[in-house]
UniProtKB/Swiss-Prot annotation:
The gene is MED27. The lineage of its organism: Eukaryota, Metazoa, Ecdysozoa, Arthropoda, Hexapoda. Component of the Mediator complex, which includes at least CDK8, MED4, MED6, MED11, MED14, MED17, MED18, MED20, MED21, MED22, MED27, MED28, MED30 and MED31. One of its GO terms (molecular function) is transcription coactivator activity. It comes from Drosophila melanogaster (Fruit fly). InterPro entries: Mediator_Med27. Keywords: Activator, Nucleus, Transcription, Transcription regulation. One of its GO terms (cellular component) is nucleus. This is Mediator of RNA polymerase II transcription subunit 27. Belongs to the Mediator complex subunit 27 family.
Length: 293
């Protein structure tokens, strides 16, 4: 390591003297045109040049005296840093070195903290607990396939609402809810939890092969957006049956979608649309702009 430091110091001195020599050549004479001034300039340059030659020989001797490593140093991907030319990427190497130093400090401090905590004589009750508390099973996904059929049959639905249940995805049910002659809604279940809702007009097809296609009517696309908001509002993994019943009740409130005026402005149509929003508690109709007023 001492030889390497001496070599680096010699290279540094050589570079400094070469820079001074070129600065001396760039400055030239003092402006005097006399023979004495020119001779002095030439003599100074020869002395500097001779000193540079001697330093070059010294650097060569020091380099030849360095021990050759048995194997090349493994730099990994950092070897590619020398190929970068842009200024914003050249600053990566010192940041990388600082990161490695920081990681080493974190490792050392963590090791010391681990040893100190192991030497602590205080005991906690959980150290002697032989059995861990087990989580309660999440049963909203693991229900009987006929549970949805029983659940929908228990809901007090008005006569204008009908249900049709099929299972194109195995045990998970898809329910087509037809609300009078107003609209249809396809509710995709995962267990007892509602995962997706598609709303279309009464005259539009809604089968298992087009559950993800939106309605061609803007009013039902708005109702579908509100249905997704209500789906998140009524979501309850702990009480999934109550969540489904509440959601179906909210969905049935659209039976008078085109017959009830807005509770705030009293108008039937605003911006070409009826009041598409139903309050989540009172089920009162509102226009989308009026509900935020």
């Amino acid at each position: 390591m001492d030889k390497l430091n001496s070599t680096l110091t010699a290279v540094k001195n050589l570079r400094s003297n070469v820079r001074l020599c070129f600065e001396h050549l760039a400055d030239g004479t003092d402006g005097e045109s006399g023979e004495e001034s020119r001779n002095k300039f030439v003599n100074d340059f020869q002395e500097r040049f001779a000193a540079i030659n001697s330093q070059i020989r010294e650097v060569e001797q020091l380099i030849n005296g360095l021990p050759v490593p048995p194997t090349p140093y493994s730099l990994g991907n950092t070897a590619y840093l020398a190929q970068e030319t842009s200024q914003d990427r050249q600053a990566l190497y010192p940041q990388l070195v600082n990161s490695y130093k920081w990681m080493d400090k974190v490792h050392d401090h963590s090791f010391l903290a681990f040893n100190n905590l192991n030497q602590n004589t205080l005991r906690r009750s959980y150290n002697y607990c032989s059995q861990k508390r087990q989580r309660l099973p999440f049963s909203s996904f693991n229900n009987d396939p006929d549970h949805i059929d029983k659940l929908l049959s228990e809901i007090n639905t008005p006569p204008h609402t009908s249900y049709r249940i099929f299972r194109p995805f195995g045990t998970n049910a898809v329910t087509i809810v037809t609300i009078s002659n107003v609209m249809k809604a396809a509710i995709v279940f995962k267990g007892v939890l509602i995962e997706w809702v598609t709303v279309k007009g009464f005259d539009e097809p809604l089968e298992h092969d087009d559950l993800w296609a939106e309605s061609r009517y803007e009013v039902f696309r708005k109702v579908q957006d509100h249905a997704h908001s209500a789906m998140l509002h009524f979501f309850s993994p702990t009480l999934p049956d109550l969540a489904v019943k509440s959601y179906i009740t909210w969905l049935n409130s659209h039976v008078k979608l085109f017959l009830e005026p807005c509770k705030r402005c009293g108008k039937f149509v605003v911006n070409g649309l009826p009041p598409t929003w139903r309050d989540l508690r009172t089920l009162e109709p509102f226009h989308e702009d009026c509900r935020n007023c």
